[in-house]
Swiss-Prot record:
UniProt domain SF3 helicase: residue ranges: 477-639
Keywords assigned by UniProt, alphabetized: ATP-binding, Helicase, Host cytoplasm, Hydrolase, Nucleotide-binding
Name under which the protein is recorded: Uncoating factor OPG117
Catalytic residue list: 170
Residues the entry annotates as binding ATP: 503-510
Gene Ontology MF terms: ATP binding; helicase activity; hydrolase activity
EC number of this enzyme: 3.6.4.-
Main location: host cell
Role, per record: Multifunctional protein required for genome uncoating and replication. Major viral uncoating protein that is required for the release of the viral genome from incoming viral cores containing the viral DNA genome. Possesses an ATPase activity that is required for hexamerization and uncoating.
Subunit-structure text: Homomultimer; hexamer. Interacts with OPG148.
Compartments (UniProt record): Host cytoplasm
Family: Belongs to the orthopoxvirus OPG117 family.
Amino acid sequence: MDAAIRGNDVIFVLKTIGVPSACRQNEDPRFVEAFKCDELKRYIDNNPECTLFESLRDEEAYSIVRIFMDVDLDACLDEIDYLTAIQDFIIEVSNCVARFAFTECGAIHENVIKSMRSNFSLTKSTNRDKTSFHIIFLDTYTTMDTLIAMKRTLLELSRSSENPLTRSIDTAVYRRKTTLRVVGTRKNPNCDTIHVMQPPHDNIEDYLFTYVDMNNNSYYFSLQRRLEDLVPDKLWEPGFISFEDAIKRVSKIFINSIINFNDLDENNFTTVPLVIDYVTPCALCKKRSHKHPHQLSLENGAIRIYKTGNPHSCKVKIVPLDGNKLFNIAQRILDTNSVLLTERGDYIVWINNSWKFNSEEPLITKLILSIRHQLPKEYSSELLCPRKRKTVEANIRDMLVDSVETDTYPDKLPFKNGVLDLVDGMFYSGDDAKKYTCTVSTGFKFDDTKFVEDSPEMEELMNIINDIQPLTDENKKNRELYEKTLSSCLCGATKGCLTFFFGETATGKSTTKRLLKSAIGDLFVETGQTILTDVLDKGPNPFIANMHLKRSVFCSELPDFACSGSKKIRSDNIKKLTEPCVIGRPCFSNKINNRNHATIIIDTNYKPVFDRIDNALMRRIAVVRFRTHFSQPSGREAAENNDAYDKVKLLDEGLDGKIQNNRYRFAFLYLLVKWYKKYHVPIMKLYPTPEEIPDFAFYLKIGTLLVSSSVKHIPLMTDLSKKGYILYDNVVTLPLTTFQQKISKYFNSRLFGHDIESFINRHKKFANVSDEYLQYIFIEDISSP
């Protein structure tokens, strides 16, 4: 290596984002400046609000840089998770870079790993809502061309890794005229978050990727040769389209005429520079003209148009030839719309009459094999080679750019072999079902021969349901809510309230749960009490993450709230669980947004207790009571004398086994669809029943007793003053002691003392140190003469 490029201590910086190219090239002092390292440090200290972005001054003349990475994770990892993730991150990226350097640059694999792992600096962002840092490998040098060539390799690593830091590598920084924010400076004047240094590195030069100081511990590698410099032994293959047609395609791309067009032939078109008559700007990049000519190369059965000199100063254009069979195979498979990219970055594949995720098994490869016989004969033979299948799969992934919205059909129930329309009862299969893009399903096949009303299973099931929730006048409202709640589990839309299944032990709650799980399969998930009692935030929460797109979530066995130490149900959680999007991510994942389609059912033997009660909470709670007890013969007499039960039935010991064997799967599914049509067509409706919650009694009643005072009540002050009201700051108010006397007429202080005190503390105001009042008026005081 030339000694002239073994050192660089002049740092070129941009003073803002988006500096015009002309100002950058002319080094306009308003926009750019060059510093020595000590000068740069002083400038930052003297201008703490400055915005500086490090960049190469002239990439064509000098492009030696340190290997660097920008990581930006939209979540805050705790210290233990961060330390584990950063260790794995260093190992993963060093292995990846070493493999690339060995393959493309002829570097020594072990030397690259040693230089990267032994010396690097790490910044830390002051933004506490995310994990963001720059990492500079201080003794590992390369060229900007090499980093740009490495971009795709790092992108594949970030997509395949399970490490959240590796998945958050910003590969967009590997480009021409790239910039990296200088440590200690802001992104823009209004942003007060910065990247700070971390020990043991406290010199600013340790955080600059363009600073070069090679020593005995340094290691340098670069690309051995450019791909466009490689000329194949045999240029034009028999399977290609004619050379004349191919070169006409090239001519149409340029728009401007190619002066030496007639000089090109099959043997020299890769070596003869194209002489363009720039009557209009370049059709590829819109620049007025180019100093260096364009040239053609032949790679992977396609003509590649690139510019000599700096090839990145103009766009590279690929002209596919019909002879590129693997590219055409990928295009043909994409044209069938059998592979799609979801909003969350997952690939889904239409195979065996249903949409499936590509994450757990190589479904794209299976799709390629299954579609092989539908392709022309000259294509199908290519797919017998595993290496070529991998190439086709890579082409498909690269060609999929636009994501699609999925699971937007709330009235469709997906199965392994098709989709059931809940409104008209039609079952769609094959291509008819393909248009309903759903990424989750029941996980079993629909069988229309079992999906009938008249069957022995249906007769048995109706007896079970009628035992659990009797069809009596006293239980009519409860039975209706039971049917509404269970049938809403078929609907793929956000539900407005949560339902508590409340009753003593052995009253049919768990039997209902098992029947529902059997009927909707993988669309059902059972979770713990933590979704109700723990704070819901951006941190790892597999319970919430597992709710994504599920249609029924069953939360079983709430604690006895009378026990000391038991957590109350968080009112905020109830509100969040009725929103379309619930925040919570799986461990080591950036996917924090979960679409909430679930009917959330809480199975409890104990009266629910909430940390805070308000109108918003009461609008979101429904209660189904279970009062039929299923007893063994030995306990029947005691159960019949228990006031908690309306009826006592003998326990069927074999029922659980029948449910687990899915005996009632399609019978119950038929019943759910029937109830769905009865209650939820055309609009899905679930109504709360706050009157069923004892803790809500005070708040429901007090809303009928009080109104907030306002200016319209001032004319009534003559009569109101006789009833204890006073006028304070032009507002009718009620002294605290008077309020307590009046409220005691409606509520027993022994039963509702805590609720009354809580209401007063929330709404009372102070006239002075000793006088307290409330800005409320009793309705009877303004309605009575």
